[in-house]
């Protein structure tokens, strides 16, 4: 028998996972006090067996992390095996010491999850495989690419081409293109480590002309890279630009900025719930748990 605890950040996704596993769903009620503290009350009874905690760690990252730890800790009182499902794992970009004195927060997160009682972690399209190793926990990284491609196949696209906004995302765009049986290209971007400013290095790309483009990324935060890439591609006389990612954080008015740059649509998964999260990953997560 399996228990699934629905964390506040992933309520809907947890319900779907629970249904697919025919599990015992335990809901959680969250109360935030005026001083910012959170208090969680679980609603439901535990059955004997392993427990899955589903809690995505997106903004407010620290609150969602503390809540995940609290849920794991409670689950551990009833189950010896506690699997934490964190579709979007905040801090995944802090996976190494880029500048002297920086703290590799992923190592800290690993200690916290283990200390709370997690025996295994399941994530979706983590930003860096190195980060996953830093956790020091038994882990599984599930790819949402097949699910995203399935969705795009239903759209009527005109001679589509897959584009990576930078060289770093080449592998991901290549995988997306392979599953979709399409070609792909990668732009070259330079980011200033100190200011975070981004610019595109390419001069001209002829193969995008009059084609629908699918810009593929693992996550979109402020949308800076996507905006720069879209503006560049629009200048090259492409047709429409679609943006897809697993995790759409879309901080502040990122969505507005991206649309203003000329993007037709943003399509993301429900690792982070929102307007763009039309692709469901409960299936692939349920498979990973089994």
Placement of each model-derived feature along the sequence:
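PRPP-associated nucleotide enzymes
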Residues: 1-290
């Amino acid at each position: 028998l399996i228990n699934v605890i629905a964390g506040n950040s992933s309520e809907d996704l947890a319900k779907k996972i629970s249904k697919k596993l025919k599990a015992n769903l335990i809901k959680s009620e969250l109360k935030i006090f005026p001083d910012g503290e959170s208090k969680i009350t679980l609603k439901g009874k535990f059955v004997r067996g392993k427990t899955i905690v589903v809690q995505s760690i997106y903004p407010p990252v620290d609150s969602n992390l503390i809540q995940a730890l609290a849920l794991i800790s409670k689950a551990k009182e009833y189950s010896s095996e506690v699997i934490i499902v964190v579709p979007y794992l905040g801090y995944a970009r802090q996976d190494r010491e880029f500048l002297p004195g920086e703290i590799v927060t992923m190592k800290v997160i690993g200690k916290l999850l283990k200390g709370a009682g997690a025996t295994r972690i399941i994530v979706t399209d983590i930003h860096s495989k190195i980060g996953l190793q830093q956790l020091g926990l038994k882990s599984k990284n599930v790819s949402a690419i097949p699910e995203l491609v399935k969705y795009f196949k239903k759209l009527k696209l005109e001679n589509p081409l897959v584009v990576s906004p930078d060289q770093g995302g080449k592998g991901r765009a290549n995988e997306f293109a392979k599953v979709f049986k399409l070609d792909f290209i990668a732009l070259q971007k330079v980011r200033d480590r100190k200011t975070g400013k981004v610019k595109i290095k390419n001069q001209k790309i002829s193969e995008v002309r009059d084609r629908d483009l699918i810009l593929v990324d693992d996550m979109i935060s402020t949308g800076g890279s996507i905006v720069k890439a879209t503006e560049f591609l629009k200048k090259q006389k492409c047709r429409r630009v679609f943006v897809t990612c697993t995790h759409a954080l879309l901080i502040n008015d990122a969505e507005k900025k991206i649309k203003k740059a000329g993007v037709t649509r943003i399509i993301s998964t429900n690792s982070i719930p929102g307007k763009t999260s039309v692709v469901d990953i409960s299936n692939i997560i349920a498979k990973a748990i089994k």
